[in-house]
């Protein structure tokens, strides 16, 4: 076989294990040599073998009725990969993993979830570093020499297979397979109504040549039992530690029939495009289930269990489900929709995308261009091994359809299966586009499955395969220039814009104008940035501009919560911490819409690529870590102490060992993390002293899944932190809050100074932490600080009382400064409990906190239900002025 591959200049960058040299040893040379896809995973994208048994001694004579299967799929699909600088996730637990800067990151810095913008430029086979990535958490470190895959359950010969055994003892299968995330094109659904998923564009699809051992061979070698023996499913589990379900691995399952069916080509893959798997793609071994949602293809595979039932893993039930459109998150939880088998996603549906014309592409109109032919292009795919047999384009809303030319580089398998995407193209006269308002495409497969005209919204935003529509507008790009045709895609990946965004803005404006007198003004981002102060605080959420200045004094979290994002697009952070009710309230403050300026490069979301980052030598780290409230500060987990079944003490190191956190007493921070692909932010108050250098401590009560019927999923952030390994990073942001203790009875509340000689403190559960900070500050300034503190602290049980040892010790050492009274809902031995049982009643408050008089301030922090009733009504009975002398953190 002879193949011409254009070589990049710097050959050193083409080392097949360059991206994993530190954490991984090279694969054994004899294993690499067996692949017909020569070279590394970086450049072997040029070479594609057909679906076949790769070992000559294992091939069937009739595997290749059409001739030599070692030929390439055509040099015209070969793209010059070039040499690009890999980037690392600095400041995260995945800092050791190299990833392509070409990928558009969709969920922040970590974990990596990204798609390739210049998808079709690389042809039929996607270069490994540019293959789309879907990670739920940190990337496990693997070692070929020590890694094993356990095969257990309903098998007669359970065993732990080494990587050498998988690669040498089983006939190798090698074939190209297109992987697609079931959430591909999800951003289109999110423009209609927000789903539970993040904004995939149309690029969550990639194709590689995978090599591995057939799963059916492995199961037969281990003696898989029959259906009569109870074997109905095969379950898979990866190695990564994830927060879902209170802490688990990623797991899922397929039916036994699919696992053992030789026509389905299910494999345990250990090579991709002729080289070892890269860390982000599952090194050293992953599952490949062709034609299926990639959510079944477990990476970093560690366990295979033949079982009588499908996987009970959290991610098997809470991901890759296509629920009916009427089911929202509350209904899904309340009625158990997650567990209904008829809504599980396995085979992918039929889909197609337009890549040419690109988004913002402009075609001038003149006497010459109107005589030209314009070639439209795109790609299409289907699931279940079905061949895409037809792609059609309409220029008139579906009244008439034009048949496209198909390009199928893939050859069918021995059993007639097609596991890969194909390309389509069609020539149209430019003059025909002048009367066209919209271009739409649809594909058909061999079972005559096609794409619906409109999308079907569903809770997880899965299986978006409606017609892909590109709007056509006659416009003049700049004053004085000639008119032409401008094309607009439905959405832009990880950027504002697209005709669906404009449509949503118009619909929202129509609804809002009926209820308010808001003008539909348009603002640029540069105008918004000018309004970033207490005098004028604007924010952008989902493309709308809001003037929140009037709400600064009323925000429950204080003005800081708004000012920290004033002048910015804070869509992701707003969605991460606000309820639907808060989102409705926001409409009151809408003043217009955000517009993007012209002059953008005329390229599609699938063609745009981010510019390489410009690295500057930064100044020395500031003494205060939280020197800029608008910036997130990466902090590394350096210690984790288990204090009880559900209480943890976490110590996080600051970026510099000489820094202090810089959090004023009474304020809090946001801890930020990407959990299941979505930003999650929660407020915490450190328990460490504000003077601590180099680190801070968080005391966290973990709310586990299925322990509270009202919140069956438990706490997203607390479970995430509980599963976080030492060495991992989280981002913190702050300070925030409207209460600050400045010492010796002095407070600043909503920006106004306040003096208090007596503090009536009421805390519930983990709400003790900001009050604990105030107590700590008062007692640290003894004997100068004369403030008297009276604390009533409520919990469910005695074991739930946080920081009790410290509180009791301080109360004993400073009886004139601090008095503590506990209230619990239930006790083990009533005769041994000297405090109150039940709820915080008026009698408890009258006995244990001071009544209202000059110099008394009530500080509250706890669950809203507790604060609203009984605390506030009872304090009001004690003559406390709720709008003056009562403050909630």
From Swiss-Prot:
> What EC number is given for this enzyme?
1.7.1.1
UniProt cofactor(s): FAD; heme; Mo-molybdopterin
Matching entries from InterPro entries are given as: Cbr1-like_FAD-bd_dom, Cyt_B5-like_heme/steroid-bd, Cyt_B5-like_heme/steroid_sf, Cyt_B5_heme-BS, FAD-bd_FR_type, Flavoprot_Pyr_Nucl_cyt_Rdtase, FNR_nucleotide-bd, Ig_E-set
Which reaction does this chain catalyze?
nitrite + NAD(+) + H2O = nitrate + NADH + H(+)
UniProt keyword Iron present: yes
Any transmembrane segments, and where?
A: none
Please tell me where heme binds in this chain: 555, 578
Please give a single GO biological process term from the UniProt record.
nitric oxide biosynthetic process
Provide the GO MF annotations for this entry. Answer: FAD binding; heme binding; molybdenum ion binding; molybdopterin cofactor binding; nitrate reductase (NADH) activity; nitrate reductase (NADPH) activity
Family in the record:
Belongs to the nitrate reductase family.
Q: What is this protein called?
A: Nitrate reductase [NADH] 3
């Amino acid at each position: 076989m002879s193949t011409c591959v254009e070589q990049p200049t710097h050959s050193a960058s083409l080392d097949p294990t360059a991206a994993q040299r530190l954490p991984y040893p090279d694969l054994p040379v004899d294993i690499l040599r067996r692949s017909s896809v020569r070279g590394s995973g970086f450049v072997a994208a040029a070479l594609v073998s057909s679906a076949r048994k790769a070992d000559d001694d294992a091939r069937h004579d009739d595997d290749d009725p059409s001739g030599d299967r070692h030929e390439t799929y055509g040099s015209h699909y070969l793209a010059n990969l070039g040499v690009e600088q890999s980037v690392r996730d600095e400041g995260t637990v995945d800092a050791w993993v190299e990833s392509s800067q070409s990928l558009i990151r969709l969920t922040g810095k970590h974990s990596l979830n990204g798609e390739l913008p210049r998808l079709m430029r690389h042809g039929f086979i996607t270069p490994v570093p540019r293959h789309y990535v879907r990670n739920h958490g940190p990337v496990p470190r693997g070692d070929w020499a020590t890694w094993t895959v356990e095969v257990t359950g309903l098998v007669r010969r359970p065993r732990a297979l080494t990587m050498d055994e998988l690669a040498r003892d089983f006939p190798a299968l090698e074939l190209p397979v297109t992987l697609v995330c079931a959430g591909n094109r999800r951003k289109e659904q999110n423009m209609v109504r927000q789903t539970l998923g993040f904004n995939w564009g149309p690029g969550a699809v990639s194709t590689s040549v995978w090599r591995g051992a057939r799963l059916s061979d492995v199961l037969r070698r281990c003696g898989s039992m029959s259906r009569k023996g109870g074997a109905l499913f095969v379950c898979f589990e990866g190695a990564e530690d994830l927060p879902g379900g209170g802490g688990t691995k990623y797991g899922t399952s397929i039916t036994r029939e699919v696992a053992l069916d030789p026509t389905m080509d299910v494999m345990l893959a250990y090579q991709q495009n002729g080289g070892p798997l890269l860390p982000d793609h599952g090194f050293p071994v992953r599952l490949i289930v062709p034609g299926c949602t990639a959510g079944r293809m477990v990476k970093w595979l560690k366990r295979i269990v033949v079982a009588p039932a499908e996987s009970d893993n959290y991610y098997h039930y809470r991901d890759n489900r296509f629920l009916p459109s009427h089911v929202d998150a509350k209904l899904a939880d309340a009625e158990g929709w997650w567990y209904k088998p008829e809504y599980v996603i396995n085979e992918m549906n039929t889909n197609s995308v337009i890549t040419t014309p690109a988004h913002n592409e402009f075609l001038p109109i003149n006497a010459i261009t109107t005589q030209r032919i314009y070639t439209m292009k795109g790609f299409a795919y289907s699931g279940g091994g079905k061949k895409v047999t037809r792609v059609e384009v309409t220029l008139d809303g579906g009244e008439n359809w034009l048949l496209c030319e198909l390009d199928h580089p893939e050859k069918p398998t021995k059993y007639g299966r097609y596991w890969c995407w194909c390309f389509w193209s069609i020539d149209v006269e430019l003059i025909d586009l002048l009367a066209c308002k919209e271009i739409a495409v649809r594909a058909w497969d061999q079972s005559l499955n096609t794409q619906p005209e409109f999308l079907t919204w569903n809770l997880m935003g899965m299986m978006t395969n409606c017609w892909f529509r590109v709007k056509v507008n006659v416009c003049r790009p700049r004053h004085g220039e000639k008119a032409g045709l401008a094309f607009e895609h439905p959405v832009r990946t990880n950027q504002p814009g697209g005709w669906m965004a404009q449509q949503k803005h118009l619909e929202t404006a129509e609804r809002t104008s009926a209820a308010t007198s808001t003008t539909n003004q348009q603002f640029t981002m540069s105008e918004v940035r000018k309004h970033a102060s207490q005098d004028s605080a604007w924010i952008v959420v989902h493309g709308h501009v809001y003037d929140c200045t009037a709400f600064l004094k009323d925000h429950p979290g204080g003005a800081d919560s708004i000012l920290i994002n004033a002048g910015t697009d804070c869509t992701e952070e707003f969605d991460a911490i606000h309820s639907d009710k808060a989102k409705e309230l926001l409409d009151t403050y809408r003043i217009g819409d955000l517009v993007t300026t012209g002059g953008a490069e005329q390229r599609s979301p699938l063609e745009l690529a981010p510019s390489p980052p410009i690295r500057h030598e930064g100044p020395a780290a500031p003494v205060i870590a939280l020197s800029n409230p608008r910036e997130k500060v990466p902090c590394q987990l350096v210690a984790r102490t288990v204090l009880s079944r559900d209480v943890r003490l976490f110590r996080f190191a600051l970026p510099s060992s000489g820094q202090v956190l810089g959090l004023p007493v009474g304020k809090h921070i946001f801890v930020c993390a990407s959990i299941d692909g979505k930003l999650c932010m929660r407020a915490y108050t450190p328990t460490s002293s504000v003077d601590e250098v180099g680190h801070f401590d968080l005391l966290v009560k973990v709310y586990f899944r299925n322990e509270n019927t009202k919140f069956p999923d438990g706490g997203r952030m607390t479970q995430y932190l509980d599963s976080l390994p030492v060495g991992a990073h989280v981002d913190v942001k702050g300070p925030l809050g409207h209460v600050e203790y400045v010492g010796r009875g002095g407070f600043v509340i909503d920006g106004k100074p306040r003096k208090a000689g007596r503090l009536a403190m009421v805390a519930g559960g983990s709400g003790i932490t900001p009050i604990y900070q105030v107590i700590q500050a008062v007692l640290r300034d003894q004997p100068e600080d004369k403030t008297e503190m009276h604390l009533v602290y409520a919990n469910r049980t005695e074991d739930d009382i946080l920081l009790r040892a410290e509180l009791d010790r301080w109360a004993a050492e400073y009886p004139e400064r601090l008095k503590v009274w506990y209230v619990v809902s239930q006790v083990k031995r009533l005769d041994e409990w000297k405090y109150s049982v039940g709820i915080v009643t008026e009698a408890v408050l009258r006995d244990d906190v001071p009544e209202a008089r000059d110099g008394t301030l009530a500080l509250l922090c706890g669950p809203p239900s507790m604060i609203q009733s009984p605390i506030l009504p009872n304090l009001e009975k004690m003559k406390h002025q709720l709008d003056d002398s009562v403050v909630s953190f």
